[in-house]
């Protein structure tokens, strides 16, 4: 028995009416995970024992009829701490790390009665855009197993797209929720920086990281954000939740909404079919009553360079804690303290992680700080100001999520710059701390194309409103890959 084609609200009704139990739903979800796992490699850990214990406790306490997420399974990216469940960040360095606490986002989800069924595969320490840098092997795209699923939240996206789970959590530092959502044809949101606590998230770029939700539909995505968003004293950068219900505007029309279409987002390097899909989406928004006009974000072209200086610099600092002494991998061939440090880190980290540590260390080094890190911070300010100018006159920004559809596995592994450029359209959103969503907008070569909507800070409910209006009048989100049971 499978329930993966039922929405969260449909599942809730079945649970409340006792047509199914939380244990039965969890068991069915675990079977969906296992039956697809060999093809996808989307999980690092399947937490069967812990999930069934949680489900039994919820059944004994009774489903909360007023809480739509009570008894619903949840997959969690492997860089988000889960009490008693391995949390490896898909790295050899943390191959045996089992936290003794839940990340705040996970704790919030559990408080709502959600059941953690496993930890999803990812690029190592969230460093990568293809899902291929994991110590545990590459995740496959749900639509075509010869293609990348995007990254770094590769497993979280593939798991939802393939029907392994209905909901999952990812993290987004430069596009790591939105790009895999686009490549797998689902809905992924990066919230405003500070909306979801980073406590318990294994840090990559602390001024950029944000936990966010994956789901098949816009409303289900918003329901999960409702569950995980909170101010948190354990995260000094968390902000008060300004929206009581992120679904509040879903279903409202968008007549008169002003949407900006940056010319830079449809320029050089954008696949022609992706460009055509986004222009058609813009026309669709106009048919729904929105006003779509071209604007300019002149400094967005510097986003990738700025990001890789700032993110790598922050990573080089954050990853200093992995030294082979306190926890995680320790080299066995070391004979003194220096060798423990050097050998453990050189053997425990993968090539992409070491590349970024080197870049960040160089950018922060004496004599180069002003030329690189300081200048990157100054250009980041210009990118923020570009967005502020546009949002003075417009409600949202529209564009593609990625310059292309999913590409072949192992096709860009030896060209890191080309892979970095795949995040060209998502990175500026992180640099500015803004919310952004990717929703399905069409297909090219049989693969999903993602549309990105960006809003000013704390405008998630408006983003969901526009995304839901598009979704309600198209059927791209209804199409499913073969592994789920679709025709594609």
From Swiss-Prot:
Active site: 77 (charge relay system), 152 (charge relay system), 176 (acyl-ester intermediate)
Single GO cellular component term: glutamyl-tRNA(Gln) amidotransferase complex
InterPro entries documented for this protein: Amidase, Amidase_CS, Amidase_dom, AS_sf, GatA
GO molecular function, one term: ATP binding
Keywords tagged on the record: ATP-binding, Ligase, Nucleotide-binding, Protein biosynthesis
Annotated signal peptide: none
Gene3D superfamilies tied to this protein: Amidase signature (AS) domain (3.90.1300.10)
Catalytic activity: L-glutamyl-tRNA(Gln) + L-glutamine + ATP + H2O = L-glutaminyl-tRNA(Gln) + L-glutamate + ADP + phosphate + H(+)
EC number in record: 6.3.5.7
Gene Ontology process terms (BP): translation
Functional note: Allows the formation of correctly charged Gln-tRNA(Gln) through the transamidation of misacylated Glu-tRNA(Gln) in organisms which lack glutaminyl-tRNA synthetase. The reaction takes place in the presence of glutamine and ATP through an activated gamma-phospho-Glu-tRNA(Gln).
Family that this chain belongs to: Belongs to the amidase family. GatA subfamily.
Subunit structure: Heterotrimer of A, B and C subunits.
Protein name: Glutamyl-tRNA(Gln) amidotransferase subunit A
Organism name: Streptococcus pneumoniae (strain CGSP14)
High-level lineage: Bacteria, Bacillati, Bacillota, Bacilli, Lactobacillales
